[in-house]
Amino acid sequence: MKKNATIVYTIKRSFVKSDISILEALDYNVFQIQSPPKKTVLAFVINRIKEKIKSIYYVSRSKILIIWFNDYHAFIPILFSKLFLKKSVIVVGGYDAIVDEQNQHGLFFNTGLRSILAKINYSLVSEIWVVHKSLEKGCSYAKEKFNIISGV
């Protein structure tokens, strides 16, 4: 019998497609929750409603929840993974692990709803995977040379 996995992402980039292919090769049935970035309040709310409905259905049936990047789209699926006692993973790519004051860049540059949710997400997931080791503990070169704080 096939195992189920749920993958959450904003845009279906090549690395997301690769992960889906890898999971399918490992005999997983892959449920997908795509939550594209939207600028209007209505579209934002509709995305959250879709995430809730899909999370209830998909996460409850999955062995694992995998989320590409930490942002709004991660919060609701993570809550349902906790509710259904499922393993959850966030894959951190950079923006969601840095503060670059000079360029005013990074999820934690501003202290608003996004950064608050991101901190909550990091505290709730089972595991945090980084795409590069410098995102785990932070990059000392980036800190010294450019005053960029990184790391989860």
Language-model segments: residues:
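Nucleotide-sugar donor phosphate/pyrophosphate-binding loop at the beta->alpha transition
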Residues: 46-50, 98-120, 144
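Short, well-ordered alpha-helical microsegments
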Residues: 15-17, 73-77, 136
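A short, charged, and often flexible helix/loop element on the N-terminal side
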Residues: 31-54, 67, 104-109
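Active-site proximal beta-strand in glycosyltransferases
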Residues: 81-100, 129, 147-149
